[in-house]
């Protein structure tokens, strides 16, 4: 599978610094977006630390196949899934320990969303409310479930209206993030890739400002992936830009 990609991050219209971070590990075809949180710029420390820790784990286990993993393998998951989950769990532990050891970073945390491509499959692992969408045949589908109070409430009340969603008082409160606790549950799923698929990784600075249909329209209508990520960021800023905005687009084509 041939992969093309483009990414863009932006501080937005209301924030003074950018706590989002994205990373590409091309040798592994692993792509990451993290949305940090915490006072005094510690959120940007957490998001970068998450991506770097995962990258370091992948490098170490690639160079030394006998390297000891910090967590036991889950027998219900494949080797590829276990490796991704382990990297994310290790990032969680490092952020948690740093937060507890250094008062400058107390309370810091981050979301993480990851896509790893192997053969004709894409593996999606995430914690928090950063998202992955798939564009296929001009239709958009969300492949992740937000770990948020709003999502929990929607599951308890499936007939919730769009207006009720917009006015939900705690819609930005997440229930899971890296660094909140010593251990973390990572959601991971695999999906079959179809040639022509586009996968969109993003922080909630995009998904909270631009509705899904508009994300699809911009992504399919742009002349290139580079134009698409720029136009998505512009749309989020036009709609208020209340948060940092990061988006990473992957296009999968038959080799």
Q: Model-predicted segments: where are they?
A:
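PP2C/PPM-type serine/threonine phosphatase catalytic domain
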Residues: 1-255
């Amino acid at each position: 599978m041939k992969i093309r990609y483009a990414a863009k991050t932006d501080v937005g219209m209301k924030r003074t610094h950018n706590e989002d971070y994205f990373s590409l590990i091309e040798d592994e075809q692993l792509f990451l977006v993290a949305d940090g949180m915490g006072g005094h710029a510690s959120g940007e420390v957490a998001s970068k630390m998450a991506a770097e820790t995962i990258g370091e784990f992948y490098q170490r286990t690639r160079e030394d196949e006998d390297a000891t993993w910090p967590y036991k393998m889950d027998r219900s998951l494949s080797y590829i899934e276990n490796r991704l989950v382990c990297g994310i769990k290790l990032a969680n532990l490092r952020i948690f320990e740093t937060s507890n050891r250094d008062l400058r970073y107390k309370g810091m945390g981050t979301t993480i969303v990851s896509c790893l491509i192997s053969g004709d499959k894409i593996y999606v692992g995430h914690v928090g409310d950063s998202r992955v969408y798939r564009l296929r045949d001009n239709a958009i589908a969300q492949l992740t479930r937000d770990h948020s109070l709003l999502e929990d409430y929607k599951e308890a009340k499936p007939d919730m209206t769009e207006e009720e969603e917009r006015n939900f008082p705690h819609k930005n409160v997440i229930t899971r993030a890296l660094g909140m606790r010593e251990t973390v549950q990572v959601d991971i799923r695999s999906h079959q890739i179809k040639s022509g698929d586009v996968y969109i990784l993003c922080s909630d600075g995009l998904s909270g400002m631009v509705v899904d249909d508009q994300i699809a329209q911009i992504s399919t209508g742009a002349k290139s992936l580079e134009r698409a990520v720029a136009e998505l960021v512009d749309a989020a800023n036009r709609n208020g830009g209340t948060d940092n905005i990061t988006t990473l687009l992957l296009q999968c084509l038959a080799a």
